[in-house]
């Protein structure tokens, strides 16, 4: 159900899920739609958005706009992760680890969409617990945010990168 489109700013946009929700009022039910989207530049920047409106296109547009505003930077290492990372949000837990060149993105559903637009090309990933797309996306982005490059760790500790890597 996800599709990619390139935009003028070279952001990749992916629609992960559209859901019909209802509000019950005295006169019956009022239906509206929610949309979950992710955007990324394919080079370490990624964000997600959740939009809600009475019509599907309006919900998607709101979600895309929120995603563009909420982008984070991810420190990638040659198209893969720096080190194994875990992330969690409510009942969803995700585990991702770097993979060698040629492995591809081994991940399911919502997690795959986030990793693709972030610019990760080789990764092994698994979602545990709830696979609700919103929670999986939040957990994946939390894990990517927690990932630190050796340069960041070295700067924080006041050491050289070689000391951190044990070379």
Swiss-Prot record:
GO CC, alphabetical: cytosolic small ribosomal subunit
Domain of life: Bacteria
Domain S5 DRBM intervals: 11-74
InterPro entries given in the database record: Ribosomal_Su5_D2-typ_SF, Ribosomal_uS5, Ribosomal_uS5_bac-type, Ribosomal_uS5_C, Ribosomal_uS5_N, Ribosomal_uS5_N_CS, Ribsml_uS5_D2-typ_fold_subgr
Alphabetical UniProt keywords: Ribonucleoprotein, Ribosomal protein, RNA-binding, rRNA-binding
Record keyword ATP-binding present: no
GO molecular function, one term: structural constituent of ribosome
Gene Ontology biological process: translation
Transmembrane annotation, as ranges: none
Subunit record text: Part of the 30S ribosomal subunit. Contacts proteins S4 and S8.
Protein role: With S4 and S12 plays an important role in translational accuracy.
UniProt free text on domains: The N-terminal domain interacts with the head of the 30S subunit; the C-terminal domain interacts with the body and contacts protein S4. The interaction surface between S4 and S5 is involved in control of translational fidelity.
Family listed: Belongs to the universal ribosomal protein uS5 family.
This protein's name: Small ribosomal subunit protein uS5
UniProt source species: Yersinia pestis
Gene: rpsE
């Amino acid at each position: 159900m996800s599709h990619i489109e390139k935009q003028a700013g070279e952001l990749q946009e992916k629609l992960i899920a559209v859901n019909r929700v209802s509000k019950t009022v005295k006169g019956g039910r009022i239906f509206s739609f929610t949309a979950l989207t992710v955007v990324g530049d394919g080079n370490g920047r990624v964000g997600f958005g959740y939009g809600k409106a009475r019509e599907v296109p309006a919900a998607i547009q709101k979600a895309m706009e929120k995603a563009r505003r909420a982008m984070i930077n991810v420190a990638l290492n040659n198209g893969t992760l720096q080190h194994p990372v875990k992330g969690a949000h409510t009942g969803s837990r995700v585990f991702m680890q770097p993979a060698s060149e040629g492995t591809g993105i081994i991940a399911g559903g919502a997690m795959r969409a986030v990793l693709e637009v972030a610019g990760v090309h080789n990764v092994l990933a698994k979602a545990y617990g709830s696979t609700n797309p919103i929670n999986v996306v939040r957990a994946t982005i939390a894990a990517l945010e927690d990932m630190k490059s050796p340069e960041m760790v070295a700067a924080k500790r006041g050491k050289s990168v070689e000391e951190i890597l044990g070379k």
